[in-house]
Structure formats: C-alpha cells, structure tokens
C-alpha cells in the first residue's frame, strides 16, 4: 500500500489537537495555544463545532487539512466516543496522507493507554458499554497503537511551561523542514537509515559516536549525507566535514596545525567565520554546552579523529558520525557502534543501474541480458553501477554490445576511488593483496597463510589489515574463504601490469609472459606468473624459460576462455622448473609427464586439470609439503605415482580421468587425506581399502560404472556419493559411521531394496532414479536428524515407509508406481512433492493433503480443489470475507502450458491480496516453484493438472493497521504465472483459526 506522504500538500493548519475538554482545556491547552501563537504555529480551533455522538464533517475536514495532529491523552480521554472517533480519523490520515502524529500523556500512565487499564481503562469500558464489538475492537487497537508512539509525559516534567516550549519547538521543527528530495531515488537507503538511527539512539541525552564503514564506492557518504539532511534540524548546530583526505592531513605533534584545524572546525560548526582560538582546549569551552551533529566523512587516519572528535568536547545529546574505509581506525578510537554497509541485493543492484542507464527502475525490452551483464561486471558496487549506467545512457543495443568487452577490464570514473585504500597500505600489505588477488582469490585463509609462508610477509596480520580496509572479505563460515571484489581484481591486475619489468614480482600480462617464456628473459625478482593463454595463439616455450626465475613460488597457466581442447603451448621435454615452486597450476599441460628434473619438495599444490598426462612423474618424490592434487579430466592418465611420502595430503581430485584403472595402495595410509573426488572414472575397477584414512570426510565415486565393490571406509566419513553405479547394496559398515550426514546413491539401477541401517546422524538421503522397489521400515524412521529425502524418479517404488518427524523436504515426484504410504504422514514441518504420482490411492492423497495443513507445501496430481476448502472458485481469482484470523491454506489447480518445452517446470507463482472496503489496497507475493523439482529427475514436467497447496498469512499492514482505520468487508486473491508457463484452472482458500478447527476440517475429508 502506497502512502501519498511523498506528494506535496497544501496544509491549511499546522496543528490539530485531539483532547478531552474538561481535563485540559482551561489550563494546559490554553497555555499550549498561547505558545503556538508566539511561535507562529496555526492551530485549528474547534470552538464553533458542537459535540455529538458522531464526529462532525467539519472536524474530519480539519483533521485532513492539518500537517501535525497532537493527541492529548488524559485520564478521561477514553470516556468520549467523540475523542475516540477523532483518533481513528487521525490514524487514517497518518496512514494515507502522511500526517505527523505526536502524543502528550497528561496525568495518565502511557501503559494504561496502551492496555486500557487503570482509571483510563475504566472510562474506556464505560464508553464501550453499548457499542458493537467492531467499534470496541477498532478503538482498542487505535489506543494501543497511539500509546506506543513516544511522546511527552507530563509526570517527567517539573515545569509545565518548559514542557510546552519543548512541544512547540518540536512542532516548529516538523512543519518548517521541507522534505529533502535529493535521496528519493537512492535504492535501499531507508534500510540503511533505519539501522543507523537505531545505532544513533537519538532520544538519549549522552554524547555518542557512531561509525559507518565499508568498501570504497559502497555508499557510506550518501548514507551520512541523508542522515545529515534528515536529522540536522533537531540539533542546535550541525557540520558536515568532507575532503578530510585532502584538507585535514595531520601529523602527531604538529600543535600549530591542529590549532588552525580547530579554528576551521569550530567556525564551520558555529557558522562564524574567522574564529581564533588561543589554545587547543578552547574547543571544549566553545562546544560543551551545545547539542551538535557532526559528520566526519572519509576519515583515513586515527590522527584525524583524535584532532577533530573528542567526545568530551560536545554537549548533551550530541552525535558524531564517522565514515571510513578502515574499520580499525574506529575501533582504535573507541567507537563501538559501527554500521558496516553491505552490498545491495541482485535486484537492488539492477535497479540502481537501471535508474542511471535508463532513468527507470527496470530495463526496457531487449536490454535485460545486457543490463544483467553490466551488473555482473560491477559486482553490485553502487558507485560502479551509477558510473557505468551514466556512460551507457541513451545508447543503442549495438553500442552496448560494442562497449561490454572494454567495460570488463576498465575502471573508468572509479579508479581513483578504488585505489585510495590500496595506496594507504604499507609495501608488504600491498604485495599480500596482489598475491591474493592474482593467485588465491576464493581460497581459505589458512591455505593463503600456508602458500605464502616463505614470502617474508606477515600474512595473518596482513589479512586482518586488508579485511579492516575492505580490500578483501573473509567469509565467517568454517572455511573462511578470502574474497576480492571483481573491480578490485581489475585494479590489482592493472597495478601488476604497470610495474617496471626489472621490479615486477608478479607477471600477469599475457604478451609479456609469452615473450619471457619464449626468450627466457625472466629474472630472480619474479615470484609469481599468472598466464592466461586465452589471449595468445601458439607458443614455443624455451627449455630455459624458468631458469632465471630462481625465486618463483607460484606458477599459474590457465585459459580464461575455456578453450581447453586446444593445446597452445609447446612444452619441451627437458624444460626445467625451479624447485622453489609451491603452486604448480598448469591447465591443459601437453606433456605426458613432468620432466625428470622436477623436484616437488616445496610443492604445496599441483593443479593440472584437462592435461595430457599419462603419469604425474616417475619415481618417488619428497612430498612432505604437498596438500592438494587435482588432475581432473586428464583423460590419458592411467596411473598415479607413489604417494606414500605425501603424509600431509588433504585433497585428491581425479574426476573424469577415464583411463585410470586403479588407485595406488599407497593412499591407504594417508591419515590426513580428507577429500577424494573420483567421479566418472569409467575404467576404475579397484579402490584400495580406505579404512585407515582417519581424516576422510568426503568420498565421491559417482558414475564409476565398473566399480564392483564398495570400498571399506573409515568411521570419520560425512558425505558419500556413489550415483550411477552398478552397486547392488550399501555396506553394513555405514552403520558405524557416526558422523555420516549425506548419502547420495541416485541412478543405482541395480539397487532393489534399501535396507541398510544408517547412523542417526544422517540428514540427507538421495536415492532418486534408482531401481528401488522397497524401503524397509527400520532404516528410515529412526533417523531423527533426517532433513530431506529424495526419491524422485524411483519408478518401481510402490509404498513409502513411516518417515521421521524431523523431515523437512520429501521429493517423490515421478514415482510412477507409488500407491500408498505405510502409516500416517507424521512430518509436521515437511514440504511434500508428489508430482506425476498418478497411482496414489485415496488414503495416501488424503494423508498428503491433511499433512499439508500442518506443514509447509504439498504438490500432487488433482483436477479440482477439494470441496472441504471453504471458499472455491474456477479460474485464477476468488473473493473471501474478511476474518480476524490472518492464517490461510491456499490451493490452486495449475496446468503446464502445452506450448512450452518438454523439460520446463513451473517457475514463479504470483499471488495478490486485495482488501475491499471503504478503501482498496493491494500487496503481491511470489512463490518460487522450480526448486520443488529434483534436477536429476528423468521427467520433471507436470503431465496433467496438479494441486499446489501452501500456507499463507495476510500481509501485516492488512491485519494489524487497516481494520481499525477502515471498514474491510472482503479480500480478493488473484493468482498468476509470472512467465506464463502454466495456467490456474481453479483456486480455493480455507481460513485457519486454531488447531482444533484444522483437525475438524479434515476429519471428514473424502475422495
């Protein structure tokens, strides 16, 4: 529902007062009126209106023509139905025309107003004695609402005159401030302001400092300016200090400089030019009795804060807001309340961009994909979205398509802003940032620390410094991945590219690298090479290409264009690699093995995906530092080397190594090995016992079609995936794997009966598209932690066993033979998906629908809404009477459009609530349906009409506010497909009251 408060209005009166005459008219109200006259405030005078049982039209008109409504709540206020009707009209105007409502509690406890208790409550009950329940309810809700509006409480004031002066000042502030429109188009701004106002705690008397921190270009200054615009009028003095970086460069101990800055600062706050201060302590004398709002924008050093923001200088109620890219500065200055500005959502980012590029909130026809691509390039950074949007304004689609390649690697208009944080770093932290950006983006913090252990950098401290300056983000999950924003990566690449050749530690320019490798012109200063071969044709590498790079730590050769089938680099067999290398990443390596001169004693990670390797190396290597081997999609690989010395190996990835026949027995004693990925190893027949791998948590053997036997596995295993194999059973030893959480055996066509007892720790089971015919009772119902069970496409499954109460998701779509449920569904929190299960018997259907009333959603075949839904209609809309309950069960019959592609599933269901009464208001919500269908399902299309049942609540504004402001008679619900991929044939609603009603509703359900 949209309020018209954003539209300018011509207000006839400044103030309307609602009061009970005998309580306040003679003394308090007369004094208040005199003060308003003194302050030039126009107040509506109701002396000429005769009071009656019904609020007069003239009074309604006056309320609607007043900018501010003051509700004077006294102990007998509720004894007047006139006053209570006035209150309803005031709240109506607040909601619909943006009227400002203020409260004064005159000799009455605010809690008595809210709860209608005490003498106030007695008066209210007497007034309600002969009224309808509807009238009583509206008045009660209105009093509760207005009682929660913070206002002046008479009991807290010793001097009534000062209280009245304060009220007059507050009214003056509210009516004299013209709303600033500068920030109306700032997407998501209100959310930021709400968080900041909460931190500022503007009602408290003490002095408070609050920080706003975040990366460059995120909108910190915009938020600060909006706060200044909105709240500066409530302070005696205010000051917005920007350009601190340029104008307030401060060095500790420069007394004269600090004194001059104090003079400028105080002059700006007090709006008095040419002020002279004799010493530094004078600033406190000038400001300590003044309530000030000070915003220090873009602070970049602790010295600036110490010089310009001491909390002891300012008067009670003062607030200081500090914006910075360095969170550590705020912490060092003792600022505990810090608002960290996050990136906008995907939809918000698109809106921000569109407002700059198209001057509208969404892309015009034909521009959606282009707009999405630019938003991706900007990685949701607001400054970049605005700058790039403006640069594309009023350009054609062809111009956009021509511009996109350049935009992917340019920083037009934002480079200087992004570089500030980087240039403020010391030399070692700059180097750390470049290493992370080029080689270790999205890697775990511990892995970054390990890889850079021999780089002479203080990595742990450096990571903290980079995170405090928002140059990196460290995820807060267990892995603690280090992430660099896309535009900062572009900046880092530009920095590396512009370095002098003899000083370059990191090579990233493809043409320069090609020359160095062909002519062997490297040098000892080079520590990292990141070579994107997408930018070159073919290259003959010199055998001595790396000979002079004696300090090389990181070598990364890859193809960002994913041209993995094209071998571009001719690698000589006798090439020599430095033994200092810690990262050896070479995609599509064309040699059959690494040269015999290769030494791996310093190697931490080897990553050679899509290679032509037949074997990694010959003989035995010293592998004490090796943590990871990734040879995925190396289709010629026939064997792995002896890994018995790789005692610290944690990750082994050989997925899609289709010629690999067996894994070496040497891996059986690698006690730190945690992850083994060997999916689609089509020739793999033998896996040695893994029982001694006490750290193993993840095992993927998907599509190892020749695998005859499930290997022995350790009790440490957490995730087992063996899809698309010929296995006929799971090992009984799984029972003892007390940490097992996920088991995926989809596509196991030879698996007929699922009877293996699993540990109670299991939370995810996927048996989809298997040959399963029967699931024994005991192997599922005792899994008290089971969250989701996927049986999609199990076409031979006839019956479901009893399921545990813990289940949240049951996917049984495309189970062609499924007829019955063994016992009642006792899954109070489960989403139930039975798409295309056309053989379900009546009892099973009844159980599914009944359970859906308790749990979340249900999808099952059906041609019509069950008659027990109290309100039903053909087509996509229906009208139901308004109810005090705000809980509903909704059923729609949907049918997939026949003209859509066969593999398409329903996507988004839109449904709109519209309340109908003496005013009409609407609200729309979206259900995302596509996730209900298993991606591995053989046939996910709805073959016939289906029932979709879901729980919904009336939007809060309709349920909590409108009923006591307007008379609501009916509610209309409309359903539609956002992408026109399905039709709504029927719809139905059941209003829910309490659990007893729900049981009664479905106790007699018949099909």
From Swiss-Prot:
<feature type="repeat" description="LRR 1">
    <location>
        <begin position="533"/>
        <end position="556"/>
    </location>
</feature>
<keyword id="KW-0677">Repeat</keyword>
<dbReference type="GO" id="GO:0005737">
    <property type="term" value="C:cytoplasm"/>
</dbReference>
<dbReference type="GO" id="GO:0002229">
    <property type="term" value="P:defense response to oomycetes"/>
</dbReference>
<dbReference type="Pfam" id="PF07725">
    <property type="entry name" value="LRR_3"/>
</dbReference>
<dbReference type="InterPro" id="IPR002182">
    <property type="entry name" value="NB-ARC"/>
</dbReference>
<keyword id="KW-0547">Nucleotide-binding</keyword>
<feature type="domain" description="NB-ARC">
    <location>
        <begin position="190"/>
        <end position="443"/>
    </location>
</feature>
<dbReference type="GO" id="GO:0005524">
    <property type="term" value="F:ATP binding"/>
</dbReference>
<comment type="function">
    <text>TIR-NB-LRR receptor-like protein that confers broad-spectrum resistance and full immunity to several races of the pathogen Albugo candida (white rust disease). Confers resistance to the biotrophic pathogens Pseudomonas syringae pv. tomato DC3000 and Hyaloperonospora arabidopsis isolate Noco2. May play a role in the response to UV stress.</text>
</comment>
<feature type="repeat" description="LRR 6">
    <location>
        <begin position="671"/>
        <end position="693"/>
    </location>
</feature>
<feature type="active site">
    <location>
        <position position="86"/>
    </location>
</feature>
<protein>
    <recommendedName>
        <fullName>Disease resistance protein ADR2</fullName>
        <ecNumber>3.2.2.6</ecNumber>
    </recommendedName>
</protein>
<feature type="repeat" description="LRR 8">
    <location>
        <begin position="715"/>
        <end position="737"/>
    </location>
</feature>
<dbReference type="GO" id="GO:0007165">
    <property type="term" value="P:signal transduction"/>
</dbReference>
<feature type="repeat" description="LRR 9">
    <location>
        <begin position="759"/>
        <end position="782"/>
    </location>
</feature>
<keyword id="KW-0963">Cytoplasm</keyword>
<feature type="repeat" description="LRR 2">
    <location>
        <begin position="578"/>
        <end position="600"/>
    </location>
</feature>
<dbReference type="InterPro" id="IPR035897">
    <property type="entry name" value="Toll_tir_struct_dom_sf"/>
</dbReference>
<dbReference type="Pfam" id="PF01582">
    <property type="entry name" value="TIR"/>
</dbReference>
<dbReference type="GO" id="GO:0061809">
    <property type="term" value="F:NAD+ nucleosidase activity, cyclic ADP-ribose generating"/>
</dbReference>
<keyword id="KW-0611">Plant defense</keyword>
<keyword id="KW-0346">Stress response</keyword>
<feature type="repeat" description="LRR 10">
    <location>
        <begin position="783"/>
        <end position="809"/>
    </location>
</feature>
<dbReference type="InterPro" id="IPR044974">
    <property type="entry name" value="Disease_R_plants"/>
</dbReference>
<dbReference type="InterPro" id="IPR042197">
    <property type="entry name" value="Apaf_helical"/>
</dbReference>
<keyword id="KW-0378">Hydrolase</keyword>
<keyword id="KW-0067">ATP-binding</keyword>
<dbReference type="InterPro" id="IPR000157">
    <property type="entry name" value="TIR_dom"/>
</dbReference>
<dbReference type="InterPro" id="IPR032675">
    <property type="entry name" value="LRR_dom_sf"/>
</dbReference>
<dbReference type="GO" id="GO:0006952">
    <property type="term" value="P:defense response"/>
</dbReference>
<dbReference type="InterPro" id="IPR011713">
    <property type="entry name" value="Leu-rich_rpt_3"/>
</dbReference>
<dbReference type="GO" id="GO:0050832">
    <property type="term" value="P:defense response to fungus"/>
</dbReference>
<dbReference type="GO" id="GO:0034644">
    <property type="term" value="P:cellular response to UV"/>
</dbReference>
<dbReference type="Pfam" id="PF23282">
    <property type="entry name" value="WHD_ROQ1"/>
</dbReference>
<feature type="repeat" description="LRR 5">
    <location>
        <begin position="649"/>
        <end position="670"/>
    </location>
</feature>
<feature type="domain" description="TIR">
    <location>
        <begin position="11"/>
        <end position="175"/>
    </location>
</feature>
<feature type="repeat" description="LRR 3">
    <location>
        <begin position="601"/>
        <end position="623"/>
    </location>
</feature>
<dbReference type="Pfam" id="PF00931">
    <property type="entry name" value="NB-ARC"/>
</dbReference>
<dbReference type="InterPro" id="IPR027417">
    <property type="entry name" value="P-loop_NTPase"/>
</dbReference>
<feature type="repeat" description="LRR 7">
    <location>
        <begin position="694"/>
        <end position="714"/>
    </location>
</feature>
<keyword id="KW-0433">Leucine-rich repeat</keyword>
């Amino acid at each position: 529902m949209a309020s018209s408060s954003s539209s300018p209005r011509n207000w006839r009166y400044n103030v309307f007062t609602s009061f009970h005459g005998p309580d306040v008219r003679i003394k308090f109200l007369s004094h208040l009126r005199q003060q308003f006259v003194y302050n030039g405030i126009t107040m509506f005078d109701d002396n000429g209106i005769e009071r009656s049982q019904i609020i007069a039209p003239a009074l309604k008109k006056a309320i609607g023509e007043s900018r501010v409504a003051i509700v004077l709540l006294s102990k007998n206020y509720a004894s007047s139905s006139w006053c209570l009707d006035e209150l309803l009209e005031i709240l109506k105007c607040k909601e619909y025309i943006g009227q400002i409502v203020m409260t004064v509690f005159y000799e009455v406890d605010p809690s008595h107003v809210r709860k209608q208790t005490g003498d106030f409550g007695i008066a209210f009950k007497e007034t309600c004695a002969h009224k309808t329940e509807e009238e009583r309810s509206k008045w009660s809700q209105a009093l509760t609402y207005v009682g929660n509006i913070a206002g002046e409480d008479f009991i807290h004031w010793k001097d009534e005159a000062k209280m009245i002066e304060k009220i007059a000042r507050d009214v003056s502030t509210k009516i004299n401030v013209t709303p600033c429109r500068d920030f109306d188009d700032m997407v998501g701004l209100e959310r930021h302001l709400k968080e900041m106002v909460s931190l500022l705690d503007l009602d408290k008397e003490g002095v408070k400092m609050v920080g706003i921190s975040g990366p460059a270009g995120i909108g910190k200054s915009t938020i600060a300016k909006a706060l200044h615009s909105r709240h500066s009028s409530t302070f005696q003095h205010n000051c917005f200090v920007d350009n601190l970086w340029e104008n307030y460069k401060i060095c500790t101990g420069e007394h004269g400089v600090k004194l001059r800055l104090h003079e400028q600062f105080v002059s700006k706050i007090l709006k008095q030019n040419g002020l002279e201060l004799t010493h530094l302590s004078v600033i406190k004398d000038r400001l300590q009795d003044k309530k000030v709002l000070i915003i220090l924008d873009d602070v970049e050093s602790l010295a600036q804060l110490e010089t310009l923001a001491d909390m002891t200088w300012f008067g009670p109620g003062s607030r200081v807001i500090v914006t910075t890219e360095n969170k550590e500065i705020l912490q060092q200055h003792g600022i505990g309340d810090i608002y960290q500005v996050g990136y906008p959502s995907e939809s918000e980012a698109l809106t921000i961009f569109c407002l700059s590029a198209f001057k509208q909130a969404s892309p015009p026809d034909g521009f959606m994909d282009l707009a999405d691509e630019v938003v991706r390039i900007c990685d949701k950074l607001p400054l970049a979205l605005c700058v790039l949007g403006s640069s594309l304004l009023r350009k054609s689609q062809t111009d956009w398509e021509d511009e996109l390649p350049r935009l992917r690697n340019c920083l037009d208009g934002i480079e200087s802003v992004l570089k500030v944080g980087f240039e403020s770093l010391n030399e070692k932290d700059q180097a750390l940032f470049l290493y992370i950006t080029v080689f270790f983006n999205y890697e775990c913090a511990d892995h970054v620390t390990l890889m850079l252990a021999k780089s002479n950098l203080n990595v742990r401290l450096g990571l903290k410094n980079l995170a405090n300056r928002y140059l990196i983000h460290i995820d807060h999950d267990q892995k603690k991945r280090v992430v660099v924003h896309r535009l900062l990566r572009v900046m880092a690449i530009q920095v590396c590219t512009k370095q002098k050749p003899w000083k370059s530690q990191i090579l990233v320019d493809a043409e320069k690298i090609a020359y160095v490798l062909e002519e062997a012109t490297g040098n000892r200063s080079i520590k990292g090479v990141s070579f994107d071969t997408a930018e070159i044709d073919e290259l003959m590498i010199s055998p001595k290409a790396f000979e002079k790079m004696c300090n090389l730590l990181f070598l990364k050769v890859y193809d960002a264009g994913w041209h993995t089938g094209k071998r571009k680099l001719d690698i000589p067999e006798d090439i020599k690699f430095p033994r200092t290398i810690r990262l050896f990443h070479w995609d599509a390596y064309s040699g059959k093995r690494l040269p015999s001169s290769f030494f791996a004693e310093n190697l931490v990670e080897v990553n050679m995906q899509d290679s032509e390797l037949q074997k990694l190396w010959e003989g035995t290597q010293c592998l004490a530092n090796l943590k990871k081997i990734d040879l995925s999609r190396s289709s010629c690989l026939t064997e792995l080397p002896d890994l018995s010395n790789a005692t610290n190996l944690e990750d082994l990835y050989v997925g899609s190594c289709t010629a690999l026949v067996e894994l070496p027995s040497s891996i059986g004693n690698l006690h730190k090995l945690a992850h083994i990925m060997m999916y689609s190893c089509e020739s793999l027949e033998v896996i040695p016992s893994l029982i001694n791998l006490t750290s193993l948590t993840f095992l993927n053997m998907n599509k190892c079609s020749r695998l005859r036997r499930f290997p022995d596995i350790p009790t440490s295993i957490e995730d087992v995936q063996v899809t698309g194999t010929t296995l006929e059973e799971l090992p009984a030893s799984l029972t003892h794997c007390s940490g097992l959480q996920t088991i995926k055996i989809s596509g196991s066509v030879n698996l007929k009966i699922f009877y293996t007892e699993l540990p109670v720790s299991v939370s995810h089971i996927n048996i989809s598209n298997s040959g399963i015919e029967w699931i024994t009772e005991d192997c599922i119902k005792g899994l008290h932690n089971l969250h989701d069970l996927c049986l999609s496409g199990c076409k031979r499954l006839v019956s479901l066993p009893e399921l545990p109460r813990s289940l949240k998701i049951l996917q049984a779509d495309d189970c062609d033979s499924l007829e019955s449920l063994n016992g009642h569904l006792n899954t109070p929190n489960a989403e139930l998906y039975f798409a295309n299960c056309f053989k379900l018997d009546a009892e099973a259907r009844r159980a599914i629908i009944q359970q859906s009333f308790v749990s979340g959603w249900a999808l099952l075949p059906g041609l019509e809404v069950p008659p027990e839904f109290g309100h039903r209609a053909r087509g996509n809309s229906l009208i139901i009477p308004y109810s005090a309950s705000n809980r509903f069960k909704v059923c729609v019959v949907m049918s997939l459009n026949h003209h859509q592609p066969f593999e398409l599933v329903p996507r988004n269901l839109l449904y709109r609530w519209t309340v109908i009464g003496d005013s009409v208001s609407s609200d729309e919500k979206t259900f995302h349906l596509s996730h209900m269908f298993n991606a591995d399902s053989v046939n996910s299309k709805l073959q016939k009409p289906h029932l979709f049942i879901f729980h919904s609540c009336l939007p809060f504004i309709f349920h909590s506010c409108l009923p006591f402001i307007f008379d609501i008679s009916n509610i209309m619900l409309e359903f539609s497909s956002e992408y026109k991929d399905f039709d709504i044939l029927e719809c139905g609603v059941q209003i829910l009251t309490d659990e007893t009603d729900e049981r009664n509703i479905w106790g007699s359900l018949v099909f």
